Amino acid sequence: SLAALAAALIGLAAMAHTATAAAPGLPVAENGKPVKVFATGVAVPTQIAFKGKTAFISGGPENNKPGGLYYVSPGSKKAKRVPDTPPIAFGVTWHHGHLYANFGTVIRVFHGWTGKRFRFSRTLVSFKPKNFTNFSGLEFGPNGRLYTGVGLQFDAKAGTKAYANSVISIDKRSGRIRTVSTGLRQPWMLTFVKGSRSPLVTVLGQDSPKGTLAPDLIVKATPGANFGFPRCNWSNVKACARLHFKKPVMTFAAAEPSPSPMGITAKGEKLFVALFGGLSTDEGPIGPEIVTTSSHGGIVRNFVTGFKAPVLLAHYHGGYLYMGDLSGKVYRVKA
């Protein structure tokens, strides 16, 4: 349910409580460029999209603060709610003059932006909550179809609701759905590397039973691929390989706090990944951060650290990396 997903986000914040003790001030980027506040006022910023210099941000709720679809006007740093939209949103993307927004069990398409509201909107696809969990991040593929993940129903077993534990693609006109990849516990955000027909997807590993070694994943969601969940959670790579499940591009080992890859975005072959809990070293947890790696997997490097709260959003646009955390702020840095 949406309530369960919202609760899960808040629960992740509790898991990553060590991250909230970061030093005061702004996050710090390894490239030496200053990190600046781009916008404030979004409870749980999950995804950002741009129409020219206007930004649209999807926001989940946090405690008593509603989420929803927000906009940030050029020259302003205050996020405002788009009128007549629901108080919860988990994904947003701009494509060919239209804004696509995920309100949990409904994806709507907007156009005719006046600077303060949209003049037109329609429902692209809708499910009843009793039959469906939720959509996650939104991203268009080079084939012109809208890709998204479908959320978990249970922590460590397969969901029984429509399309649960899968990545799907949607026809942007008819709303017809096609299953792309299955066996994914909680696919979250997606990105397409230039030249690739399949998205890279962040996937959150299971939390139970206590002490589970199930890692978080980044996968390449190719048509027909099965990544094994719940039969395989990639805590035993050899066992998963013997069962012929498709291998993830990379894994983040289980830790406390959990790394929890959320937002993912590409600049060429380089990936920027938002880690809700961050990596852990011999000296202890780094805290929420943005890391870089290759679209083929490989070395993971710290890129932006020092967030005061768990970080969810990562989006590369126009020479800047945009990042958002549970303090309600969206930042940007040249990257």
Regions found by a protein language model. Give the residues of each.
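Beta-rich, blade/repeat-based domains predominating
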Residues: 41-54, 85-102, 129-146, 182-198, ...
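Sec/Tat signal peptide C-region and signal peptidase I cleavage site
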Residues: 15-21
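Beta-propeller domain segments
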Residues: 23-29, 135, 151-158, 162-175, ...
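Blade-loop segments of beta-propeller domains
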Residues: 67-96
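Asp-box/WD-like beta-propeller blade repeats and closely related beta-sheet repeat scaffolds
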Residues: 105-140
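Residue-level marker for isolated small/hydroxyl-bearing positions within beta-strands
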Residues: 58-60, 102-104, 149-151, 202-204, ...
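A short beta-strand motif characteristic of beta-propeller blades
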Residues: 34-40, 78-84, 122-128, 176-181, ...
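Bacterial N-terminal signal peptides
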Residues: 3-14
